[in-house]
Amino acid sequence: CFCKRPVCDSGETQIGYCRLGNTFYRLCCRQ
């Protein structure tokens, strides 16, 4: 899985969030 922003790539599913410093990322996993 990867932490991405602003959105997950097509073909990936968001399963949660990551926080790095004061920035939130989406936790995206490939199916």
UniProtKB/Swiss-Prot annotation:
InterPro entries: Alpha-defensin_C. GO terms for biological process: defense response to bacterium; defense response to fungus; killing of cells of another organism. HANP-2 could be a product of proteolytic N-terminal amino acid removal from HANP-4. Pfam families: Defensin_1 (PF00323). It is found in: Secreted. Disulfide bonds join 1-29, 3-18, 8-28. GO terms for cellular component: extracellular region. Belongs to the alpha-defensin family. This is Neutrophil defensin 2.
